[in-house]
From Swiss-Prot:
PROSITE patterns: COMPLEX1_30K. It is found in: Cellular thylakoid membrane. GO terms for biological process: photosynthesis, light reaction. Its main location: membrane. It is a peripheral membrane protein. This is NAD(P)H-quinone oxidoreductase subunit J. One of its GO terms (cellular component) is plasma membrane-derived thylakoid membrane. Pfam families: Complex1_30kDa. GO terms for molecular function: NADH dehydrogenase (ubiquinone) activity; quinone binding.
Length: 172
């Protein structure tokens, strides 16, 4: 009796959603990823094409950056910058959503800033920079927002080692 092959996450074929198909039809290279637990479509793009794709999605109606954030896949692995976009309109009973992910090499975590498309990215990109060290090129004021200016390292990276001591000077 032949052994049945069951797809694994690495081999499973993900059907492209409407946004991924629209991007592909308009010449924007992307990869459809598995939808999240709420059914939100997720697309992966390269950092070199993030800005043109972000501008195209804005023109396509994704006028609200609900959330920008980052996460670490683990020591020695990629960092991820993600963008949760929503189409907001007066007549939408269920707004369309999409999440765009950019996987960045740990040794060179640079991605263009989307601040010039969605102004709400300002503090969100700063927080992601502060916690993960992802550099948002073209951001007008990329500096720490949560940690002290002289803090060393990126506290939410999985390979981060907490300092034994940090002296807070001129705190009062």
């Amino acid at each position: 009796m032949p052994e049945e092959l069951t797809p694994t996450p690495e081999t499973a074929v993900v059907e492209a959603g409407p946004v991924s198909r629209w991007l592909s039809e308009n010449g924007f290279e992307n990869t459809a990823l598995e939808r999240d637990h709420l059914g939100v479509e997720i697309v992966q793009v390269d950092r070199e094409v993030l800005l043109p794709i972000a501008a195209a999605l804005f023109a396509y109606g994704f006028n609200y950056l609900q959330c920008q954030g980052g996460y670490d896949l683990g020591p020695g692995q990629d960092l991820v910058s993600f963008y949760h976009l929503t189409k907001v309109s007066d007549d939408a009973s269920q707004p369309q959503e999409v999440r765009v992910k950019v996987f960045l090499p740990r040794h060179d975590p640079k991605v263009p800033s989307v601040f010039w498309i969605w102004k709400g990215a300002d503090w969100q990109e700063r927080e992601t920079f502060d916690m993960y060290g992802i550099q948002f090129e073209g951001h007008p004021n990329l500096k720490r927002i949560l940690m002290p200016e002289d803090w060393v390292g990126w506290p939410l990276r999985k390979d981060y080692i907490s300092p034994d001591f940090y002296e807070l000077q001129d705190a009062y």
